[in-house]
Design a protein with these regions (language model features):
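Recognition helix of helix-turn-helix/homeodomain-like DNA-binding domains
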Residues: 172-188
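N-terminal interaction modules that seed assembly of large macromolecular complexes
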Residues: 10-67
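Short, basic-rich loop-to-helix N-cap that marks the start of a DNA-contacting helix
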Residues: 57, 184-197
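DNA major-groove recognition helix of helix-turn-helix/homeodomain DNA-binding modules
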Residues: 65-73, 192-208
């Protein structure tokens, strides 16, 4: 699986996003939903999710929260806040969400469109006591339920091709195409030749065929 950025920065990213949300709610007195909307609208979420070194490593969660407000042109009254070791539900939300975004390389917007931030914070109990992979599996199930079609099926349909026609044109076996579209075979592990022929026929990039969310059974 291709992750959003180097794992070297993951721990820092989780801490920063968790602290940002905790600080925004408990010190800046924003609602979780409103503040995360600002995070998305300012473009900082996209930068963070793509591994922007300045945001992942160069800022603390508190600094990131202030930057969101500044970018959104909201009033900012900086104050010195003592570090707290408390781990609120909002902190866990940022911590877990940062991990999931890194793991799947989905954008934060794509994630929130399927599972709103209010629903994620509501998962604090019981998921904060579980291994993070159980949270990931649950989020993946939600995402796949909301997006049942694979990228291959979506691109094939857009091109106006049947499975049989795509197989005839590309030389990829019909059964293999069916298995990719049914998620019974992982297209991310497909032969390079298959991916190249499919991308040429469907007028897309090879990476457009890849799946960011894979069923846990795979």
């Amino acid at each position: 699986m291709i992750h959003a950025y180097d794992k070297l920065y993951l721990d820092k990213a989780q801490t920063a996003l968790g602290r940002m949300l905790d600080f925004a709610v408990y010190e800046l007195h924003h609602t979780l939903e409103d503040f995360f909307t600002l995070f998305l609208k300012t473009g900082l979420a996209d930068r963070f999710g793509s591994g922007d070194y300045e945001l992942l490593v160069g800022m603390s969660g508190v600094e990131l929260a202030y930057t969101v407000l500044e970018e959104a042109e909201k009033p900012v009254n900086r104050k010195k806040i003592p570090y707290t070791a408390d781990r609120s539900p909002e902190y866990w939300t940022g911590w877990a969400l940062a991990y999931y975004q890194w793991d799947t390389a989905l954008s934060f917007r794509e994630i929130i469109q399927v599972v709103p931030i209010a629903e994620i914070v509501a998962m604090y109990t019981p998921y904060h006591e579980m291994d993070i992979r159980q949270f990931v599996d649950h989020m993946n199930e939600r995402y796949l339920k909301a997006n049942p079609d694979t990228n291959l099926k979506r691109l094939r349909t857009r091109a106006g091709l049947s499975q049989h026609a795509l197989a005839e044109t590309t030389g990829v076996p019909l059964r293999t195409i069916q298995q990719y579209e049914q998620r019974r075979k992982n297209i991310n592990k497909a032969q390079a030749e298959y991916l190249l022929m499919l991308s040429r026929t469907l007028c897309c990039r090879v990476e457009d065929l890849m799946e960011k969310v894979i069923p846990s059974s795979e």
